[in-house]
Structure formats: C-alpha cells, structure tokens
From Swiss-Prot:
Family: Belongs to the tetrahydrofolate dehydrogenase/cyclohydrolase family.
Protein name: Bifunctional protein FolD
Organism: Ehrlichia ruminantium (strain Welgevonden)
NCBIfam families: PRK14187.1, PRK14188.1
GO molecular function, one term: methylenetetrahydrofolate dehydrogenase (NADP+) activity
Amino acid sequence: MEGNIVSGKAVADNITNILATCISDLKAQHNLTPCLIVVLVGDDPASQLYVRNKQRKAEMLGLRSETMLLPSTISESSLIEKIHQLNNDDSVHGILVQLPVPRHIDKNLIINTIDPKKDVDGFHNENVGRLFTGQKKNCLVPCTPQGCLYLIKTITRNLSGSDAVVIGRSNIVGKPMACLLLGENCTVTTVHSATRDLPDYCRRADILVAAVGIPRFVKYSWVKHGAIVIDVGINSIEEDGVKKFVGDVDFAEVNKIASAITPVPGGVGPMTIAFLMVNTIIAACNQSGIDGFLEKYLDL
C-alpha cells in the first residue's frame, strides 16, 4: 500500500483562488483592501526568501503588502517604536515581524508589542490565551497549525474521537496544533525529546503531526497502518553530494503504511503562507467591523 500524497501546494492554490475572489468582492462591496506589513530585521538570506514569498503571494491576491527593511543593528527600543507606529496606522491591518530577530532583541517582547488585532502570526499572548481557552473564533490562530488542520480536513471531515499525536511542543506549531485538534474532539498526546518510548505513542495515532526539526525522524515502524501523517519539518541535508530539503518523516518508507501523507517540500509550507493571507483578511474585516465576510467563501 502507498498512501495518498496530499499536495499542500494544490490545496493552497485552491485557497488562493478563493481568497482572490473574496478580496475583489471586499474591495467592491466595502472599499476595503487588506494591508500586510512585514518587518524584516537584518539580511538573513532565508528570512529574505520567506518574506519575498509572502509578498509575492499577497500581491497575487490583490492584498496591499509592504516590507519594512531594518538594519540588524537597530536597537530594541527603536524597533518597538516602529511597531507602535504601525499599530497606530489604521490603514495597516496585519503586522508580521519575521523571525528570528537579532540576539540583542527580545523576541517575546517584540511579539507582544504588536497590537493583537493585527498579529497575523497569532503569537501574541492575547491570541494564544484566547485559543487555549476555546475562543478560536475571537482570535488570530497561528498559520502553520491552521494549515495543517485544513489539510487533515481535506482527507477526513470527522475527526471526533480520533487519536492524535503531535511530535513537538513549540509555541509556533506543537502547542497550538494540539489545541486545534482538541477543539475537533480528538484525543491528543504531545510527545517531545524527553518522552520515554516515543515510538509507542506514535503507533497509537490515527493522526500523526511531526514538528520536531530532525530529518527523517519518524520511521516506518512508528506509524499505525492507515494513519494520516502531516510532516511540518523542513530540513536541509546533503545526500550523495547534493543538497536537498526533507521533512521530519522518512517519507519513502512511511508512505508505504500511511493512508495519507504530506510531502516535503510542497506540503505544509504553502499552507502556512495561504493562512497568513487568511489571517490578514480576517484582521482587516475585524478592524473594519465587517462580520463573517470570509466565511462566505472559505469553510474554516
């Protein structure tokens, strides 16, 4: 048996087409163009690539998107002042500070300086708190876990009662992913580097989400027959003298036992960017007092 390879790119492209129509109608009906500002501190090549991809996608959809380029030497206080200016600008609906930031800057302080209504990454303490207290409809949810859940729902709509295992406990993916799965009435187990007998937990999973950052960490023998496997990892390795990207799952082997699996690249990555656009539209509508507009186009 080989699993159904779930193309995040194909699903994200479909979402993009839907969002383009939504934004066009938003402009026509409410004279509103959602605006996303990405703050990039320093000149890290990987961060520059991520930012270009986000801006390209925003422009494709008809969003207004700008990148604020700041030197790596900027002081923490100056960066905070820049964010306050964006918070106070009513034409700006979404603010994203590209991570990582230089070591002399407190990442958590910066995240929590962003107005939570404009925090399209969903990392602000207020958004996290609302998500973890069952107020998903009243907050901005982190993009990658949202994208993962959407992919899972393209495979099966009824998740209630499923055993779900999340490998990883980061604030960006692991914890919010577990919370979203709990919201779907899954029985959720979070495992991590200190978990004893980690493979045994994985073998119980109807849904297995790998977000640990270790190349090909999840082996064939760890996976239940027919499981849905979502691979969040993106790891650069060199193999036979060739650099390539691989996930946290041993794709070639696990694909033989899973009922559905996401590839790397082309799986979760495109979904993350798609849901950044979703969050920007939600933020723009919320700030403009427009209720339920996106839900007419996209079932979240």
